[in-house]
UniProtKB/Swiss-Prot annotation:
InterPro entries: KRAB, KRAB_dom_sf, SCAN_dom, SCAN_sf, Znf_C2H2-type, Znf_C2H2_sf, Znf_C2H2_type. The keyword Zinc applies. GO terms for cellular component: nucleus. Residues 134-154 are annotated as: Disordered. CDD domains: KRAB_A-box, SCAN. SMART domains: KRAB, SCAN, ZnF_C2H2. Residues 49-131 form the SCAN box domain. GO terms for biological process: regulation of DNA-templated transcription. This is Zinc finger protein 287. It comes from Pongo pygmaeus. It comes from the Eukaryota.
Length: 761
């Protein structure tokens, strides 16, 4: 016995035991009526399976037609158009497993409607353990095991199962509801409809429980989709008068009628129905169905009877017909029964010809309506099956949180969330799970098994849900739609995350700093800031990252991959964010505006960085020298001065740089690319800064001003060199003679004195 059953809590145990005892202790009409009241009906798949398994060979149709019908029934059951091979295999295994179970256990397990063989096994295991523990108090569930039984404990565990195989199954007559004709006449239309419903539900419940049931002929009549629209009252019939002349006077006809019709059981009506059906030739008094009917006229005119037998047969046949027609008709029909009159040795009947005018259900018409959800159906059995889904919904309630479940096994699995119980343990790594299905999925990590394959691209998956999600990449299906903005998503989780944009909900809270997040993944990424954990390592340069996405982006530096391409100019980028930034150069859009100076930016990150120029905030500090920076990228670039790291290397000449932008600019030396062009004179430049400086020659702009002498300059470097005149700073020193200079160009010229190099004009 699995640990799950051993550690089952008392709430689950009591619910299973109560269900088992109530089903086992009650038999006959009460048990089935209880099932009716709770509407524990068979699912559509089970009905299709029964139709397939119990399909009779039609002699008149021939073998080819029979094979075609059988194939159609099989397709309705297995549904290969929506089920995978694994799902069809699961249906077959579940069917065979339920077949080999002992009778009463099979009945009980079926009544729980397991959706998989794994769920059915769990039900049997849980029930087995409970009954073993209850065995000392309940002698009806098990027998005393002999002391010298060679089978030992196993015999005790399985003995109660074997005993159940010999139990006798009930028949349809055992559950038939008996009523008298007098009771029927006193019933209201709603009660008559209920009686019809109960009769059909009794039959379908016995089929759903796997019992061998001979189909009474009244069942297909009750299931026929037709309605009575009117009845025709006729006068005396000459044919009836002729037949009535053969009957001699009767002193007390009412006595005969009462005796014959005192108690008419449902199964008796089946016998009369069989007789009438065998003697039917059509014509006078007929119930119309799709395939057959029976005639009272033909039945009464077959042979001559004495008066008493003639009249009593008439009443009995009439009463049974009234019973059938009242069971069938869906609307309350008032039947005007005119009394038989005997006059001077002749029987003249002013009879009612129940000439019920029927019409077939029109195409598309659905006369049967569900009282719960309002859904309509063409056939009554379809309504019964549908109503079972409402009754089966949420039958088991969790005592901890009040949540309801359809199946007891689902409740047991749910309660492990409250208890923290994880009875299913992986033998490979020791990880434990609350459900066996989760363990099965986990074990595929160790085995490498990926049983679910995409038919389009051949990619394999370990879980069916992952395959379903993947297939949407091929179909483009996005079934999850936001009701606020209409945006659609391929995953339900993506829709949930998106909806938090509208609601502003941030349910994930960091325990360290209290910061909230709308997605759990964002919280996990944030928590790595506090822990300092960087589990993702680059195999090329051994750099570590806190997030896998950062590592993927970094690896594109080594591979040179640029998978994001601009549709306007064809330029490619390694990161999607860089492409988005680039696209703003084509649109000119600058939607982020500074509230202080009014300057506009194309990206929110640029606006955030700009704000720091007003506030003076420098949140990024170097741990080595203490220097602070307003941007994290500037800190990263600065730290490379201390560690000497130059991760950006030119593939042509091997020169390395601390910044990727410097490498990009350097590579233009090899390619000769000059992407920055002056609109005034057409001159092109390698660097954007060079273009900016050049354009000032056309505009005359001199934005850099000396605070000492108010002299203006077009370039910042020129201002820096000029300011050294005021400060006397000479940062460039000769290594040979120690002479210092204010500009690097002056130092280069001086060094030629020592080297003997001549300046080129």
């Amino acid at each position: 016995m699995l640990a799950s059953s051993k550690r089952m809590n008392s709430s689950s145990r009591s619910q299973i035991l109560l269900r088992w005892k109530s089903d086992k202790a009650q038999s006959g009409p009460y048990n089935v009526e209880k099932e009716i009241l709770t509407s524990r009906f068979l699912r559509d798949t089970e009905t299709c399976r029964q139709n397939f398994r119990n399909f009779p060979y039609p002699d008149l149709a021939g073998p080819r037609k029979a094979l075609s019908q059988l194939r159609e029934l099989c397709l309705k059951w297995l549904r290969p158009e929506i089920h995978s091979k694994e799902q069809i295999l699961e249906l077959l295994v579940l069917e065979q497993f339920l077949t080999i179970l002992p009778g009463e256990v099979r009945t009980w397990v079926k009544s729980q409607y397991p959706e998989s063989s794994e769920e059915a096994v769990t039900l049997v295991e849980d029930l087995t353990q409970i009954l073993e523990e209850e065995a000392p108090q309940n002698s009806t569930l098990s027998q005393d095991t002999p002391e010298e039984d060679p089978r030992g404990k196993h015999a005790f565990q399985t003995g109660w199962l074997n005993d159940l195989v010999t139990k006798e199954s009930m028949t349809f007559k055992d559950v038939a509801v008996d009523i008298t004709q007098e009771d029927w006449e006193l019933m209201r239309p709603v009660q008559k409809e209920l009686y019809k419903t109960v009769t059909l539900q009794n039959y379908w419940n016995m089929v759903s429980l796997g019992l061998t049931v001979y189909r009474p002929t009244v069942i297909p009549i009750l299931e026929e989709p037709w309605m009575v629209i009117k009845e025709i009252l006729e006068g005396p019939s000459p044919e009836w008068e002729t037949k009535a002349q053969a009957c001699t006077p009767v002193e007390d006809m009412s006595k005969l009628t009462k005796e014959e019709t005192q108690t008419i059981k449902l199964e008796d009506s089946y016998d009369y129905d069989d007789r009438l059906e065998r003697r039917a030739t059509g014509g006078f008094w007929k119930i119309h169905t799709n395939e057959r009917g029976f005639s009272l006229k033909s039945a009464l005119s077959q042979e001559y009877d004495p008066t008493e037998e003639c009249l009593s047969k008439y009443d009995i046949y009439r009463n049974n017909f009234e019973k059938h027609s009242n069971l069938i008709v869906q609307f309350d029909t008032q039947l005007d029964n005119k009394t038989s009159v005997y006059n001077e040795g002749r029987a003249t009947f002013n009879h009612v010809s129940y000439g019920i005018v029927h019409r077939k259900i029109l195409p598309g018409e659905k006369p049967y309506k569900c009282n719960v959800c309002g859904k309509k159906f063409r056939k009554y059995p379809s309504l019964l099956k549908h109503q079972s889904t409402h009754a089966k919904e949420k039958s088991y309630e969790c005592e901890e949180c009040g949540k309801e479940f359809r199946h007891i096994s689902s409740l047991i699995a749910h309660q492990r969330m409250h208890t923290g119980e994880k009875p299913y343990e992986c033998h490979q790594c020791g990880k434990a799970f609350s459900q066996r299905a989760h363990l099965t999925i986990h074990q595929r990590i160790h085995t490498g098994e990926k049983p679910y394959k995409c038919d389009d691209c051949g990619k394999d998956f370990s879980q069916r849900a992952h395959l379903t999600i993947h297939q949407r990449t091929h179909t483009g299906e996005k079934p999850y739609k936001c009701l606020e903005c209409g945006k659609t998503f391929s995953h339900s989780s993506s829709l949930i995350n998106h909806q938090r944009v509208h609601t502003g909900e941030k349910p994930y809270i960091c325990n360290e700093c209290g910061k909230t997040f709308s997605q759990s993944t964002h919280l996990l990424q944030h928590q790595k800031i506090h822990t300092g954990k960087k589990p993702y390592k680059c195999n090329e340069c051994w750099k570590v990252f806190s997030q896998s996405t950062y590592l993927i982006r970094h690896q594109r530096i080594h591979s040179g991959e640029k998978c994001y391409k601009c549709n306007e100019c064809g330029k490619a980028f390694a990161h999607s964010s860089t492409l988005i930034q680039h696209q703003t150069t084509h649109t000119g859009e600058k939607s982020y505006i500074c509230n202080i100076c009014g300057k506009a930016f194309s990206q929110s990150a640029n606006l955030t960085q700009h704000h720091r120029t007003h506030t003076g905030e420098k949140p990024y500090k170097c741990s080595v020298c203490g220097k602070a920076f307003s941007q994290s990228v500037h800190l990263t670039q600065h730290q490379r001065i201390h560690n000497g790291e130059k991760p950006f290397k030119c593939n042509i000449c091997g020169k390395a740089y601390r910044q990727g932008a410097n490498l990009t600019q350097h590579q233009r030396i090899h390619t000769g690319e000059k992407p920055y062009k002056c609109n005034e004179c057409g001159k092109a430049f390698i660097y954007s800064s060079s273009l900016n400086q050049h354009q000032r020659t056309h505009t005359g702009e001199r934005p850099y001003k000396c605070n000492e002498c108010d002299k203006d300059f077009s370039q910042r470097t020129c201002l820096i060199q000029h300011q050294r005149i005021h400060t006397g700073e000479k940062p460039y020193a000769c290594r040979i003679c120690g002479k210092t200079f204010t500009q690097s160009t002056n130092l280069i010229q001086h060094q030629r004195v020592h080297t003997g190099a001549k300046h080129r004009n």
